[in-house]
């Protein structure tokens, strides 16, 4: 694993989507020493249970829960330090590239044969107005829908729901449903589909 941080550097509302590979997703989050130290400077204590406690609000570590241990230098040395050239070509998919590639059918963003070739226990597709179809579909595993542009109508036997950008919908396994834009204009949506890939190395 590598350490990474996230910051909204624009002026508009920002949202981050994190997808974990099911119940065997790698053993949880490992915190960089700087994160633990910065939290303490602001009166925050990170517990070994992964929860944050705010001393300014009178919170403290529960009985039996110690502070998150600070990672030692020998453990830090095992973490790779990737360059921009390591990361961008193999691990970044740009919105407008995905938008263009999904003009007639959904583009597989993360998957064995995706733009980002990986098998983390799920696949991610990107769907736009041009690649959306009214035909019903279902999946063996649960899926998740997250619009990023436009409003989308999700219909199934007995109901429907309209999703706006930033909304999230969990679709049960084996549920026949359709995914179509609900209004005119630009429309784009992420579809995350679980699969049977085991946890562990990608290949």
Give residue ranges: language-model regions.
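A short beta-strand-loop-beta hairpin characteristic of the jelly-roll/cupin
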Residues: 2, 9, 138-165, 175
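Tight coil/turn sites that cap or link beta-strands
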Residues: 1, 129-132, 165-168, 172-176
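Conserved hydrophobic/aromatic beta-strand scaffold that supports enzyme active sites
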Residues: 18, 124-126, 144, 160, ...
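Double-stranded beta-helix
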Residues: 3-80, 178-203
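Intrinsically disordered, low-complexity segments enriched in Gly and acidic/Ser/Thr residues
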Residues: 115-126, 138-144, 151, 187-189
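Beta-strand elements of modular eukaryotic interaction domains
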Residues: 135-136, 180
């Amino acid at each position: 694993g590598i350490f990474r941080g996230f910051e909204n550097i624009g002026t508009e509302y920002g949202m981050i989507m994190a997808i974990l590979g099911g119940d065997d997703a790698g053993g949880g989050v490992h915190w960089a020493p700087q994160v633990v130290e910065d939290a303490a400077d602001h009166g925050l204590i990170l517990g070994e249970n992964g929860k944050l406690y705010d001393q300014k609000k009178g919170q403290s570590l529960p009985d039996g829960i110690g502070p998150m241990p600070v990672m030692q230098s020998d453990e830090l040395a095992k973490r790779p330090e990737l360059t921009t050239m390591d990361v961008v070509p193999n691990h970044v998919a740009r919105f407008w590239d995905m938008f263009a590639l999904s003009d007639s059918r959904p583009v597989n963003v993360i998957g064995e044969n995706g733009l980002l070739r990986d098998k983390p226990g799920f696949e991610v597709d990107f769907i736009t107005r041009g690649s959306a179809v009214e035909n019903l579909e279902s999946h063996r595993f649960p899926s998740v829908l997250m619009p990023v542009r436009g409003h989308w109508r999700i219909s199934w036997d007995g109901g429907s729901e309209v999703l706006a950008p930033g909304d999230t919908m969990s679709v049960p396994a084996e549920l026949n449903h359709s995914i179509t834009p609900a209004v005119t204009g630009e429309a784009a949506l992420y579809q995350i589909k679980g699969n049977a890939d085991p946890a562990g190395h990608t290949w």
